[in-house]
Amino acid sequence: ALMGHMVNAIYQIDEFVNLGANSIETDVSFDDNANPEYTYHGIPCDCGRSCLKWENYNDFLKGLRSATTPGNSKYQSKLILVVFDLKTGSLYDNQASEAGKKLAKNLLKHYWNNGNNGGRAYIVLSIPDLNHYPLIKGFTDTLKQEGHPELLEKVGYDFSGNDAVGDVAKAYKKAGVSGHVWQSDGITNCLLRGPTRVKEAVANRDSGNGYINKVYYWTVDKRATTRDALDAGVDGVMTNYPDVIADVMNEAAYKNKVRLATYEDSPWVTFKK
């Protein structure tokens, strides 16, 4: 997955996909009542980017639905995976479940069109705090209660806090999650981070008895870092510059080894070499 970072305005969906992304990451901020409110990051953010672009969350979902519904005039067939970076740091721990419920209702109505020919992209709910694992159950229970358990086939999970791999595994156990797990590792592009933990995550993915299905690395803007990530065997690279990553993927060392995922590839099944 070639993941466009911080895609928070509707017009940026086309911008990033046209540069080569087949996946986008979008920030979601919450109001005091745990309602998803805006697709907004705020200051500070990655170097070289505007931190202030935003939409109302429900409006963004409608724009995203247009971009991922075959037959729609705005349809982008390459866009197959969306990571919602859930900014739950503004919430109390005891609001996590409520945030999950409200998120499920919003997605069901505005993205999945109540199960009636909605958007087709796979969704990853990315949570920054292991203590907010009840968000997952709030989300999954709500989709079941609303009569759409089949949509959970389209949903995966990520804890994005760079926590110890063992601690993340425990949080998933508490949340009742087995499968559909993406593990992120990374840091803002303003700083450097070594590949130690991403290699650990890849090892867990490939061990056959780990909890991780896919690993992605963020935020990768330089060719050298891209090569390091591809050499480590990641499944996804998140970037501010999709065209840079696409260039590296076309280099002789990689063009026969890696390719962009298509809709037919499962985002939940670990790729066997």
Swiss-Prot record:
Gene3D superfamilies: Phosphatidylinositol (PI) phosphodiesterase (3.20.20.190). The keyword Nuclease does not apply. Binds 1 Mg(2+) ion per subunit. Keywords: Cytolysis, Dermonecrotic toxin, Disulfide bond, Hemolysis, Lipid degradation, Lipid metabolism, Lyase, Magnesium, Metal-binding, Secreted, Toxin. Disulfide bonds join 45-51, 47-190. It is found in: Secreted. Coiled coil: none annotated. InterPro entries: PLC-like_Pdiesterase_TIM-brl (IPR017946). Belongs to the arthropod phospholipase D family. Class II subfamily. Dermonecrotic toxins cleave the phosphodiester linkage between the phosphate and headgroup of certain phospholipids (sphingolipid and lysolipid substrates), forming an alcohol (often choline) and a cyclic phosphate. This toxin acts on sphingomyelin (SM). It may also act on ceramide phosphoethanolamine (CPE), lysophosphatidylcholine (LPC) and lysophosphatidylethanolamine (LPE), but not on lysophosphatidylserine (LPS), and lysophosphatidylglycerol (LPG). It acts by transphosphatidylation, releasing exclusively cyclic phosphate products as second products. This is Dermonecrotic toxin LhSicTox-alphaIA2aii.
